Swiss-Prot record:
The gene is ACTR8. This is Actin-related protein 8. Belongs to the actin family. ARP8 subfamily. It is found in: Nucleus; Chromosome. Component of the chromatin remodeling INO80 complex; specifically part of a complex module associated with the DBINO domain of INO80. Interacts with ACTR5; the interaction is observed in asynchronous (interphase) cells but not in metaphase-arrested cells indicative for a possible dissociation of the INO80 complex in mitotic cells. Exists as monomers and dimers, but the dimer is most probably the biologically relevant form required for stable interactions with histones that exploits the twofold symmetry of the nucleosome core. Pfam families: Actin. Residues 1-25 have a biased composition (Basic and acidic residues). Plays an important role in the functional organization of mitotic chromosomes. Exhibits low basal ATPase activity, and unable to polymerize. Proposed core component of the chromatin remodeling INO80 complex which is involved in transcriptional regulation, DNA replication and probably DNA repair. Required for the recruitment of INO80 (and probably the INO80 complex) to sites of DNA damage. Strongly prefer nucleosomes and H3-H4 tetramers over H2A-H2B dimers, suggesting it may act as a nucleosome recognition module within the complex.
Length: 624
């Protein structure tokens, strides 16, 4: 065989291989990999770092670690000048709480909670007897703390060496009298951009870089100069801001110096971590709750929604309810970091969703603030322990007025660096529509007289009908440009979504209603049936006793009757494989690192430097 014939044979094999890949549905790379396939060795999992950034907690670790390091996602920065005003991002407090209508809304929400508690019978078939706060108040007002020890054992962070910044627990325990600003770089699942000090995009990214770098050095014991040998898997929210994701990827690759990155959505990673292929993911975090339906590794765009409340709101609501019952620790302040930690602890210790626990009960708790005596308080609580977590189902009880409480997946923001962003596609689509209309007009004008006579009643509106069909199709495609496989979704799902945008974005949906809405936006009854049969709850915001049974009862009672007849069981899973629900998404990121298919998803530093955000469109596991 001649050299030319050999070359033709090899070219034929390559073309045949490409054709076979296309038939299998493998994406043809728009941007060729700068690292040849022959040199792309299997990436060792212990050189992959999985990062799951939350609003309150950062979870970070090697893909081979059994558990990640979990640290408060906060930084304290020293004042650059003396006399600089003190600034600290709030934790339990938020905008919209002190409006004139807030208290009335709280009371109305609490009435709905009490009605729901009364309407559901206990396991013995009897109604639950309500306990008024007045029954506990007289006892609690008389209680005084007992001194356990003159030293609590906790100390403020030592700042005598004037560190420029402190991270995690050290930042939380900075003395308020020291000259440090406190920043939480992520709020309600998004970058904490605000008009105050440290609220610019550049400042927030700088805070995140410092926190993550500190965690990698301290907890993973990896020198920052060695990050060029490591790759990163970054978990992002299902409803994400493209600009923010782009900046985070740029920071990880170009500033921190990782050699490669894979970006994936929290919900899909939660399915990997739980071992479920198709499920409705309910992620109840500290500051936001997100719901979406995932099927075979794809997060259905139309089913995604984010609720702007979570565990912190339950803690604040619990404090309000305890105050009504005469909470004996009267110095408690929501602006104090130590008191916020205490309230979170009290919520996790006492709150539940068990209808069978009723009546007044005695409790005690300790206060161990730094450089203060250790105090023991005793007090009584009744229905407050059940009412607070039920606020997740009746969010009016949070008393938040004038804030956007529900977010659905919106059309994407344009990006000048991305030549194929949605704005470009919509503009070219509009030109195609105009061209099609002009062609249709010309064809109708050039028809023979006899033909026109046969269609006399229809010819005048034929181009308009043709154009309207194209426009409808175009709008359906335009709505599905940002996130994947949605061009195949039924028109009914699209209309359901458009109606939802107008109806729900101004309202605070309860958790059960949000789940029902998300499942209802699935494109087929078969998919809806799958989702009703498997609801996975992750995150730390719903870790209450009997939460599984409570949520299951709410979904069963409110789901459409047509599905209630055909679905044998609504399965609510709160601890898959007996795992901590707060770690499931991170664990899924670690599983993702070990999959063979992940090798095609890596974005390398040199590629990002050359092609930028276009690499996300090419390599992301979801449609960018």
């Amino acid at each position: 065989m001649t050299q030319a014939e050999k070359g033709d044979t090899e070219n034929g094999k390559e073309k045949g291989g490409e054709k076979e890949k296309e038939q299998r549905g493998v994406k043809r790379p728009i941007v060729p990999a700068l690292v040849p396939e022959s040199l792309q060795e299997q990436i060792q999992s212990n050189f992959i770092i999985v990062i799951h950034p939350g609003s309150t907690t950062l979870r970070i670790g090697r893909a081979t670690d059994t558990l990640p390091a979990s640290i408060p996602h906060v930084i304290a920065r020293r004042h650059k000048q003396q006399g600089q005003p003190l600034y600290k991002d709030s934790w339990l407090l938020r905008e919209g709480l002190n409006k004139p209508e807030s208290n009335e809304q709280r009371q109305n929400g609490l009435k709905m909670v009490d009605q729901a508690i009364w309407s559901k019978k206990m396991s013995n078939g009897t109604r639950r007897i309500p306990v008024s706060p007045e029954q506990a108040r007289s006892y609690n007002k008389q209680m005084r703390p007992a001194i356990l020890d003159h030293c609590s054992g906790n100390k403020w962070t030592n700042t005598s060496h004037h560190p420029e910044y402190l991270v995690g627990e050290e930042a939380l325990y900075v003395n308020p009298l020291d000259c440090y600003n406190i920043h939480w770089p992520i709020r309600r699942g998004q970058l904490n951009i605000h008009p105050g000090p440290g609220g610019s995009l550049t400042a927030v990214l700088a805070d995140i870089e410092v926190i993550w770098s500190h965690a990698i050095q301290k907890y993973l014991e990896i020198p920052l100069k060695d990050l060029k040998y490591y790759r990163c898997i970054l978990l992002i929210p299902d409803i994400y801001n493209k600009q923010h994701v782009k900046e985070l990827v740029n920071m990880i690759l170009m500033k921190m110096g990782f050699s490669g990155i894979v970006v994936h959505q929290e919900s899909v990673c939660a399915t990997y971590g739980s071992g479920l292929s198709s499920t409705c993911i309910v992620d109840v975090g500290d500051q936001k709750t997100s719901v979406c339906c995932v099927e075979d590794g794809v997060s259905h765009r139309n089913t995604r929604l984010c609720l702007a409340y979570g565990g912190s709101d339950v803690s604040r609501c619990f404090y309000w309810l305890m105050q009504r019952a005469g909470f004996p620790y009267r110095e408690c302040q929501l602006t104090n970091k130590m008191d916020c930690l205490l309230l979170q602890h009290l919520k996790e210790t006492f709150c539940h969703l068990d209808q069978d626990i009723s009546g007044l009960q005695d409790h005690e708790f300790q206060i161990r603030h730094p450089d203060s005596p250790a105090l023991l308080y005793q007090f009584r609580l009744g229905d407050e322990k059940l009412q607070a977590p039920m606020a997740l189902f009746y969010p009016a009880t949070f008393g938040i007025v004038g804030q956007k409480m529900t977010t659905l997946q919106h059309r994407s923001q344009g990006d000048p660096e991305d030549p194929h962003d949605e704005h470009y596609l919509l503009a070219t689509q509009s030109k195609q529509e105009q061209s099609a209309k002009a062609t249709a007009d010309r064809k109708s004008a050039s028809k023979p007289i006899g033909f026109e006579g046969d269609l006399r009643g229809q010819s005048s509106d034929l181009p308009e009908r043709l154009h309207s069909q194209e426009v409808d199709l175009g709008s359906a495609q335009g709505d599905g440009l940002m996130a994947g496989n949605d061009s195949e979704e039924a028109l009914t799902a699209l209309m359901s979504r458009k109606t939802a945008i107008s109806l729900f974005e101004g309202k605070a949906l309860g958790l059960d209603k949000a789940i029902l809405h998300s499942i209802d936006c699935c494109s087929s009854d078969d998919t809806k049936k799958k989702m009703y049969s498997s609801i996975l709850v992750v995150g730390g915001g719903l870790m209450f006793h009997k939460a599984q049974e409570f949520l299951q009862h709410r979904i069963l009672n409110k789901m459409p009757p047509s599905f209630r007849r055909i679905i044998e069981n609504v399965d609510v899973i709160t601890r898959p494989k007996d795992m901590d629900p707060r770690l499931i998404a991170w664990k899924g990121g670690a599983v993702l690192a070990c999959l063979d298919t992940t090798q095609e998803l890596w974005i390398y530093q040199r590629e990002w430097q050359r092609f930028g955000v276009r690499m996300l469109r090419e390599r992301a596991a979801f449609v960018w």
